[in-house]
Amino acid sequence: MPIDRRAGSVKRRRIKFRDEAFSIHMTASITSTETQEGPVTSGFWALTLGSIGVVFGDIGTSPLYAFHEAVRGAAHGEPVTRVMVLGVLSLILWALLIVVTAKYVLLLLRADNNGEGGTLSLMALGQRALGRRSWFLLALGVVGASMFIGDSMITPAISVLSAVEGLKLATPALEHYVVPLTVLILVLLFAVQSKGTALVASAFGPVMVVWFTCIAVMGAVHIADDPSVLAAINPYYALQFLLSHGTIGLVTLGAVFLAVTGGEALYADLGHFGRKPIQAAWMFFVLPSLLINYFGQGALVLSDPSAIEHSFYRMVPEHLVLPLVGLATAATVIASQAVITGAYSLVYQAVQLGLLPRFEVRYTSESHAGQIYLPRVNRLLLIGVMLLVLLFHTPSNLASAYGIAVSTTMVADGIMGFVVIWKLWNWRAATAAAVILPFVVVDMSFFSANLLKLLEGAWVPLLFGAAMAGTIWTWRRGSGILIQKTRRIEVPLDDLIRSLEKRPPHIVKGTAVFLTSDPSFVPTALLHNLKHNKVLHEHNVVLTIETAHTPRVDLSERFRMEKISDKFSKVRLRFGFMEQPNVPKALAIARKQGWQFDIMSTSFFVSRRSLKASAQSGMPLWQDHLFIALSRSANDATDYFQIPTGRVVEVGTQVTI
């Protein structure tokens, strides 16, 4: 990424981990965004088909429950009326057009971070735009990301439950098997995550094309029976319903939001498919299919108000219910898979940005580096999903918990989007506010409507999100305290080199690489090696690993070396926050710059800290213990940076935190 010379120098954001071995610098260049259109090696239509299978799974399965829940909320126990149906349809239509189409598809998809999207990418883009540390943007990014994790638990539960619930309509005797079958499907889904999804991912696009085609045909048949339902296109019905129904209108608005959940995924998956394929898939296929189905459900309920109980499945003849249940189950599994994969990617980005400790990462594909599996995250999601299914039992109960997490993320995206439009795109503040403020107002309206369901279940994603945000806060705060304590005993590297030149220790052959967070000071492992072994290698490398504010960095920017004496060199390796750090592979690039790197004659020295809790650390004891637990759960630096274990020497120290 080019550096703006007018800025004078690159400004660094340092986020330190529990030991020097996995300290990471966040480096940002103050420069304008270079818009990328995502992968260009595959054909446009192949990418469009792929986006239909991955990006739109969540929002594409919303017709299973969104219209049903919204009309039930509007009726509030009373008979369903034409005014209610048209009001709900109009609200759904304009919510999809304003929140998803205008805000995400037409606006935020242009706010890419070197081709990548998502809440944390937007946060990093905003930080870069401001050119300084912004705790406000960091807080927004953390809240948005935390709520996405909560959403990642609810989406599989409500989607699969809604699909399997169709069995009750086909065969009432199967009603008692809905929850057990849902649990079985979800357990199998999470169990196969470690094997990767490469074998079945190619079928996601075609299956979802069949799904969207089917729901569009189902809707078109019923619209043909009662074309008057198309009157709901007029926004008058939406406004009239809200103004005339008071609190019930606000409650209904919370249920209508179910129709746009998953809209944020369009932005999160930007890097996988590119802007134009996602826009084409949404505008010309997915959006029309969804609207036709929603209006078809409306036409059905207008002709038979009792159909609202199972409005989606009642759209087909009885003998087609079971095949539709099968197709719906496949679609919801695909939607769940996309959300689970998104959670892995989000946590991985958080780790790279220093917001979480290094969790174990397994790569499930030799050809696609982005296909990863995080065992701890998988277990956490499985436990959360199982608890939701067993506690709430039905999609209607879960609907109360759904929405609050997504609406929170959307509000955060809107505010961070304003910063990017204002500072990075160089729009006038008033113009940027005029563009983004209406979207934030709409998002806040949905957020307020979902808050009304706090006691009915909305507390669940808020609890998950608060726990996640608390974990990130603890990790950041504990890391900061650890840095302060380390600073007090650190020795400047230049002072040590001068001292060693005057009184050189015994020199041994080979190269020693010392991982550190700050190359200006002596790595702890180097100090202990001199203190206990009383030797110095022929070549000593002080290695710093940085994470950029961009998803990827060019190979030309990966490696930088500075020779500071005959025996000492400083090396900086730089990775994007979506790249897997591979230290030996990156160091091999150094050969092109004249450094003869040989892995077999190189030893990597890693310092590992043993932490103890202290009431005087600045954090409450419970936070001390949480930070220590997070530190212990972190993956080894050798594994994370893919360093051969046979070439690693670990040096331990004890620190009171």
From Swiss-Prot:
Which reaction equations make up its catalytic activity? K(+)(in) + H(+)(in) = K(+)(out) + H(+)(out)
Q: Is-annotated flag, keyword Transmembrane?
A: yes
Q: Which InterPro entries match?
A: K+_transporter, K_trans_C, K_trans_N, Kup
Q: Cite the entry's keywords alphabetically.
A: Cell inner membrane, Cell membrane, Ion transport, Membrane, Potassium, Potassium transport, Symport, Transmembrane, Transmembrane helix, Transport
GO terms of biological process kind:
potassium ion transport
Q: Name one GO molecular function term.
A: symporter activity
Compartments it resides in: Cell inner membrane
Name any GO cellular component annotation.
plasma membrane
Membrane topology according to the record: Multi-pass membrane protein
Q: Where are the transmembrane segments?
A: 40-60, 88-108, 135-155, 172-192, 198-218, 241-261, 282-302, 320-340, 380-400, 402-422, 432-452, 454-474
Q: Which family does it belong to?
A: Belongs to the HAK/KUP transporter (TC 2.A.72) family.
Q: What does this protein do?
A: Transport of potassium into the cell. Likely operates as a K(+):H(+) symporter.
Q: What is this protein called?
A: Probable potassium transport system protein Kup 1
Organism annotation: Bradyrhizobium diazoefficiens (strain JCM 10833 / BCRC 13528 / IAM 13628 / NBRC 14792 / USDA 110)
